[in-house]
C-alpha cells in the first residue's frame, strides 16, 4: 500500500491570531474572520495545550463558524467549545485529502472529544517469500520489506496458523528459516509426516517445487476450484497408470484443500474479497465487528471497542472507525456496512486514493450480502454484551485493588513486571498492563537485558535495570501525554522491591507522579494462595485464600510471567537456530551447503583444521583461512 500525502499548507498568519483573553465561542468567532472557504483540517486546543478535537471540512470558514453559534449544540460539543483556548488550521487541495489527514491526526494525537479506535494493531499476513531459490511459506506482521507475495489480513495468529497448516498438507512448501534450511544434511520430520517436499536435500527438483509454490499462490488468490479440478484429474490419471502412491499423495492434498474451503463459520458465497463491518451500540458503548473475506474464504473476525461519548450515533462511530482503521492498512475492493453513513462516497474516494485502486462502501438491503452483515451484527451485539459484563466485574476487582494497596483513586493502569533467563543467558524483562478494560496487550513491552544493563544472572539487578529504563522514559514522555501507572507490581519479594525503590527514589518517581510500587512474593514452596505482598515501609501482608482480589493479582502476576517466558523462549530459539556461518563475509548459501555437507554440522566446521577446510569443494585457500581465523577469534 502506498500512502498518499495531501498537498497542504498551514495557515500561519500572526495578524489573524485572536486576543489572548478570548476563549470558547468568542475565540472561534475571531478565528472565522480570517479563514478561507477552502477544504482543510482544524485542531482545537485546551488551556494546557492538549488537543481537544480534530475535524475536517469541505469549507473551513462555514464549518468552523458553526462552533461560534452558541445554540443547537449537544452537551459534548458545548463542553468542547467552552474549553477551547486555541485553534490551528491546515488547508488542503480537496476534501478527500482533508479526510486522510484528519484520520492520521486523530490516530496520532488521540484527542479527547474525537471517537477513537482502540486496540488497533497490525494484523498477521501469510507471506510466500521469494528472495531464496526455494520459496518459504511463513506468517508475517509489520512492514513489508521481504520480497514475495503477501496474503491477508487474518483476524488472528490462530487463523494464520490454521491456514498455514492446511497449506503445508496441500502444497508441501517449506516453512523453515533460511539458516535451518541451509544447515540440513537430511530431511526433517516435516518431510516424514508429508508436510514438506524436502527441497533442502534435493528430494524434489527446483521446477517441481516452483510448481507447488505456484499452486499455493493460486489457492491463496482464490483459484481453489480450478486447482482442485486439476489435482483430481491428475489423481485419476495416476490411478489408471497403477501409480497408487502418487494417487494417494494427490488425494491427501485434495482433502486438505477441501477442509479449508468448507470449514467456514460464515458462508461467503458470492464474496471473493470484502470486509464486513458492523456496529452495535448500547448504554453509550459500542462494538465494531469486522469479518475478513479473501479469496472466497472467511479469514476470521475481530472485535473493536472505540472510545466515544454517550451521545455518539452508531453511524457516526462506524464512519470514524472506517477512516482510522484503514489509515495504515490496505482496504479491500468492497466494504460492506451495517449502517448507512453520510460520507460513504467520500470515504471510498479517500481509501481508493490511499490504496491506489477502486474501493467501494456499500450497505446491502437484502440477499446474501445482507445475511453476512446481519451475522456480523449479531457477533457485535454478543461481543458488546460480554464486554459490558466483564467491565462490571473488572470494576469491582479494581475497587478491591484500591482498597488493598490504599490507593487514592480507582486504578486506571496497573503495570506488572517480571524477568526470565537461564543462568543469565537470553535474559529478558517483561511489562504487562491491565486496567478497567482488562489486559491491554497493545501496551505490553519486553526489555532485552544485556551485560551492560545489569548482571543478567542477578534477578535483583535485572529488575532494577528494567525499571530504571521504564521510569526514565516515563519522566521524559509524561508531559507529552504518556500514560502513568497508578500501581506498579513487581514479581518478587522484599529484595526486589528494595532494588526498585532505590531507582524510584533516585529518579524522584514516587514524588513526581504519586505511583504506588508493591511486590508480590510466591508463598512457601511456591504455593498459590499463600502469596505475601510488600509495600515500602510497611510489614508484609497476605490476603484471605478465597478473596477475589487475590485471584486477580495472581492472574496479573501469571500473565507477566507468561509474557516474559514467551519472549525468553523466542530469544533462545532464535539463538539455537542461528547458524554461526552466517556471520562470515563471503559465505553464501552454496558455500554454506558445501561446508555442512562435508563436515556434517557447523560445530564440526568450527573445529576443523585449516587443511580440512581447504579440501572442501568451492572453498579456496584464502576463504579457508578466513573461516579458520573467524572461529579462532
UniProtKB/Swiss-Prot annotation:
InterPro entries: GIY-YIG_endonuc, GIY-YIG_endonuc_sf, GIY-YIG_UvrC_Cho, Hlx-hairpin-Hlx_DNA-bd_motif, RuvA_2-like, UVR_dom, UVR_dom_sf, UvrABC_protein_C
BP-aspect Gene Ontology terms: nucleotide-excision repair; SOS response
UniProt subcellular location: Cytoplasm
Assembly: Interacts with UvrB in an incision complex.
Protein family membership: Belongs to the UvrC family.
Function: The UvrABC repair system catalyzes the recognition and processing of DNA lesions. UvrC both incises the 5' and 3' sides of the lesion. The N-terminal half is responsible for the 3' incision and the C-terminal half is responsible for the 5' incision.
Protein name (Swiss-Prot/TrEMBL): UvrABC system protein C
Origin species: Maricaulis maris (strain MCS10) (Caulobacter maris)
Lineage, opening ranks: Bacteria, Pseudomonadati, Pseudomonadota, Alphaproteobacteria, Maricaulales
